[in-house]
Amino acid sequence: MEGKGKEIVVGHSISKSSVECHKYYLARRTTMEMLRDRGYDVSDEDINLSLQQFRALYGEHPDVDLLRISAKHRFDSSKKISVVFCGTGIVKVNAMRVIAADVLSRENITGLILVLQSHITNQALKAVELFSFKVELFEITDLLVNVSKHVLRPKHQVLNDKEKESLLKKFSIEEKQLPRLSSKDPIVRYYGLETGQVMKVTYKDELSESHVTYRCVS
């Protein structure tokens, strides 16, 4: 009986660690896909890493420090972003100070993504606002699936400033006349868009022709 009890405990432990590892794997892959779609230089080799390869590299209990990602923008070398995976504990203001000091000591970045597994305190959120660059917060559960790949989601394309200007001129309208898209929309957060940026949204239906609309982030 004692032996069986031990076997159950061990099995449960292995299962729990496997789930944890798989969660990190999925979230990191989605994050790299997200960076690539934003124009950052991320290799296909990193994105296509299998779960087995991920386990071989990082183990069943990955060290979050080793999961960090840094990438430069393909078309603007002055833009560099870092991704930091926070641990399972509550993120307090002291943790934010440590992250800030560590990131800034390593590299000169223009953006930071924090992947959270637990609650972040109000004081820590206030500390985030003091950073000199844009900081984005994502729950790890929001990154287990790539929202841009959902079969029911229409195709989204981010317009650059020139394309936006041409659009407004073509239809003789002002930015405020465009349909709005909330800054909290998952696809807006995925692309890291700012207020005023415009997305081209293409809807496709098997029974009808594709329909295109433009929406402005508010």
UniProtKB/Swiss-Prot annotation:
The keyword Oxidoreductase does not apply. Keywords: DNA-directed RNA polymerase, Nucleus, Transcription. The keyword S-adenosyl-L-methionine does not apply. It is found in: Nucleus. InterPro entries: Arch_Rpo5/euc_Rpb5, RNA_pol_Rpb5_N, RNA_pol_Rpb5_N_sf, RNA_pol_subH/Rpb5_C, RPB5-like_sf. GO terms for cellular component: RNA polymerase IV complex; RNA polymerase V complex. Expressed inleaves, flower buds, flowers and siliques. Gene3D superfamilies: RNA polymerase, Rpb5, N-terminal domain (3.40.1340.10), RPB5-like RNA polymerase subunit (3.90.940.20). Its main location: nucleus. One of its GO terms (molecular function) is DNA binding. One of its GO terms (biological process) is DNA-templated transcription. Component of the RNA polymerase IV and V complexes. Interacts with NRPD1. DNA-dependent RNA polymerase catalyzes the transcription of DNA into RNA using the four ribonucleoside triphosphates as substrates. Component of RNA polymerases IV and V which mediate short-interfering RNAs (siRNA) accumulation and subsequent RNA-directed DNA methylation-dependent (RdDM) transcriptional gene silencing (TGS) of endogenous repeated sequences, including transposable elements. Belongs to the archaeal Rpo5/eukaryotic RPB5 RNA polymerase subunit family. This is DNA-directed RNA polymerases IV and V subunit 5B.
